[in-house]
């Protein structure tokens, strides 16, 4: 393969960072194609733990080109904080190792302010935003009033755009929401400083990435969030503001669909989600608490406790269909060791009918009753398993059920957070 995608097959937090890090060993280029610093990836290398939000996971290798695509919304302050954090851990970051699309949109201070104000105004109908300005930045992109990286690094263009945009945003902040106006000079001077620091990293990434593919280089596209958080196919409105599925790669990195050869869906061996929204297999009992504690299910970006539930194969089948997944990588199967009985959802009962897809209507999904198939658990810790044959028989049966139901093979299994706790079962 020369170009493949790694994306979340559930509600995010599936272990994409670890899987990208694992697969990046054989890649030449790693590309982030959507989202912003609302994403959180944890990668463990040896005894060191790295927490990434914006920068692609390939940065932990010395010989990879890392790309932030045009589909990403870029917070310069967050970017340079992350660069400083990584450099403090000994990771070198230079324009030879990291490039940023000139077409990426920039998150501005008013985006963060509006994100918080609007969320508070929703009251008990809040959607669980991270408050980092992601949604408002994508809104400006679609309204054609956003500021792109290429605008930011051209002083005159930035000055004019900021004046026009800030005038409108301040009216909304003060007159609609009763907030305090933002100071033009303060923002202008702060972002001019970012512009100079960004300039060496800024490129037309579509040209570079397509040339790498044409030259036969291995290109890995790294997704953020997950399929059920996609702006179109997720549990709307409890979704993110970008396209998290395979189709998002084409618009978020400037490559054609025929360039993509494989798509790997990352899925936990159980299901989690953060924030509000329907969750058919949610466990609201001691088993859910046990899984949360054993799996350390707390958000990298927000610190929020994740809701936990049984594995939902309807969701995985939907993800495989929407993104044309060629295989799954299953993570955290080690977390389930110790449970006597495991359940997997193989369908929903909705208004007396059995369905095997995720309905678009939030109201319908909330009514869905999960139909379960039970499996015997396993007592053995499998953290030391290094090949498929090391896994308990019941764990293998569990993985086989995923393959049979979704009609998609499981190519990778993870039994812990470290690189060497990963086994490749088949080619992806």
Curated annotation (Swiss-Prot):
**The EC number(s) this enzyme carries:** 6.3.4.4
List the cofactors: Mg(2+)
Binding sites annotated in the UniProt record for Mg(2+): 13, 40
For whether the record's keyword set contains Nucleotide-binding, the answer is yes
User: GO annotations under biological process?
Assistant: 'de novo' AMP biosynthetic process; IMP metabolic process
List UniProt keywords, sorted A-Z. Answer: Cytoplasm, GTP-binding, Ligase, Magnesium, Metal-binding, Nucleotide-binding, Purine biosynthesis
Gene3D superfamilies attached here? Adenylosuccinate Synthetase, subunit A, domain 1, Adenylosuccinate Synthetase, subunit A, domain 2, Adenylosuccinate Synthetase, subunit A, domain 3
The record's cofactor note says: Binds 1 Mg(2+) ion per subunit.
Compartment(s) of residence: Cytoplasm
Q: Binding positions for GTP?
A: 12-18, 40-42, 306, 332-334, 414-416
**Pfam families recorded for this chain?**
Adenylsucc_synt
| SUBUNIT field | Homodimer.
What does the similarity note say? Belongs to the adenylosuccinate synthetase family.
Protein name (record): Adenylosuccinate synthetase
| Organism of provenance | Clostridium botulinum (strain Langeland / NCTC 10281 / Type F)
């Amino acid at each position: 393969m020369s170009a493949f995608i790694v994306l979340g097959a559930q509600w995010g937090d599936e272990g994409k960072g670890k899987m990208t890090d694992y697969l990046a060993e054989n890649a030449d280029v790693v590309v982030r194609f959507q989202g912003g610093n609302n994403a959180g990836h944890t990668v463990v290398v040896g005894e060191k733990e790295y927490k990434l939000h914006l920068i692609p996971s390939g940065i932990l290798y010395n010989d990879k080109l890392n790309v932030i695509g045009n589909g990403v919304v870029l917070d310069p302050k967050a970017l340079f904080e992350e660069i400083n954090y990584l450099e403090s851990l000994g990771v070198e970051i230079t324009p030879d190792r990291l490039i940023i699309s000139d077409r990426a949109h920039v998150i501005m201070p008013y985006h963060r302010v509006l994100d918080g104000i609007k969320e508070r105004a929703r009251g008990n109908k809040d959607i669980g935003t991270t408050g980092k300005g992601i949604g408002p930045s994508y809104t400006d992109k679609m309204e054609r009033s956003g500021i792109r990286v290429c605008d930011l690094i051209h002083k005159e263009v930035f000055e004019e755009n900021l004046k026009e945009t800030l005038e409108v945003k301040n009216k909304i902040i003060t007159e609609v929401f009763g907030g305090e106006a933002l100071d033009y000079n303060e923002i202008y001077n702060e972002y001019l400083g970012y512009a100079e620091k960004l300039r060496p990293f800024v490129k037309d990434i579509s040209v570079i990435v397509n040339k790498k593919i044409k030259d036969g280089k291995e290109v890995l596209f790294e997704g953020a969030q997950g399929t059920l958080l996609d702006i179109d196919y997720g549990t709307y409105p409890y979704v993110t503001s970008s396209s998290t599925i395979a189709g998002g790669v084409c618009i978020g990195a400037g490559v054609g669909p025929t360039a993509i050869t494989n798509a790997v869906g990352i899925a936990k061996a159980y299901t989690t989600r953060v924030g509000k929204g329907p969750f058919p297999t949610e466990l609201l009992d001691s088993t859910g608490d046990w899984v949360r504690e054993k799996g350390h299910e707390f958000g990298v970006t927000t610190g929020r406790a994740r809701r936990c539930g049984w594995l939902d194969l309807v969701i995985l089948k939907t993800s495989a269909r929407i993104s044309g997944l060629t295989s799954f990588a299953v993570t955290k199967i080690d977390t389930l060791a110790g449970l006597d009985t495991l359940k997997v959802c193989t369908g929903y009962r909705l208004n007396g009918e059995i369905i095997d897809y995720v309905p678009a209507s939030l109201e319908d999904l909330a009514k869905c009753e999960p139909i379960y198939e039970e499996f015997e658990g396993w007592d053995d810790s499998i953290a030391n398993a290094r090949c498929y044959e090391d896994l308990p028989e019941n764990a293998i049966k569990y993985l086989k059920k995923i393959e049979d139901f979704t009609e998609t093979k499981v190519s990778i299994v993870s039994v812990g957070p470290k690189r060497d706790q990963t086994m490749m079962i088949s080619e992806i």
